[in-house]
Amino acid sequence: MTQDNKLQVEAIRRGTVIDHIPAQVGMKLLSLFKLTATDERITIGLNLPSNQQGKKDLIKLENIFLTEEQANQLAIYAPHATVNRIDNYDVVRKQTLSLPERIDGVLTCPNSNCISRSEPVASGFRVQVHGQQVHLQCKYCEKEFEHQAVVQSA
C-alpha cells in the first residue's frame, strides 16, 4: 500500500486563486478586503507547505475575478503573492503583484487625530517607495507612516 503525502486543495472551475500569501496573512486578507462578502464558494488553505516560503496561505474564490487594481492592493500585505485567473480548471492568466499608487477603503490611519477615524469617510493612502522602505501618506491628515505602522493598526 502506498501513501500519498501530498496535501490536496480542491481545484476550482473558474475564478481567482491567490497563492503564495505569507502564512498567517490569509485570514487578514479575507477580512480587510471583504473577500467573504459573497455567496460563492471560497476555499482557504492556511499554513500549507511551500518550497519557497516554508509555509504559505492560499485563497480560492470561485466565480469571482479580481481586477488588476484590486489584486495590486493585496501587495501591501502579500508582496510576493500571485493572483491566478482560472477558467475551465486551467490558469489562463498569472499576475504578479506590484504596489499600487493608492490604497483606498482598506487600511486605518494610525493618527488618532485624523478625521478618517471619527467621520464616516473611506480611508485613503498614497503609496510611496523610498529605497527599500514603503511609506503610506493619509489623504486626510497628510501624515506619512512606515507601511508596517499602518498595516499593523488595521
Curated annotation (Swiss-Prot):
Pfam families: PyrI, PyrI_C. GO terms for molecular function: metal ion binding. Its cofactor is Zn(2+). Zn(2+) binds at C109, C114, C138, C141. Binds 1 zinc ion per subunit. One of its GO terms (biological process) is pyrimidine nucleotide biosynthetic process. Keywords: Metal-binding, Pyrimidine biosynthesis, Zinc. GO terms for cellular component: aspartate carbamoyltransferase complex. InterPro entries: Asp_carbamoyltransf_reg_N, Asp_carbamoylTrfase_reg, Asp_carbamoyltrfase_reg_C, Asp_carbatrfase_reg_C_sf, Asp_carbatrfase_reg_N_sf. Gene3D superfamilies: Aspartate carbamoyltransferase regulatory subunit, C-terminal domain, Aspartate carbamoyltransferase regulatory subunit, N-terminal domain. Involved in allosteric regulation of aspartate carbamoyltransferase. Belongs to the PyrI family. Contains catalytic and regulatory chains. This is Aspartate carbamoyltransferase regulatory chain.
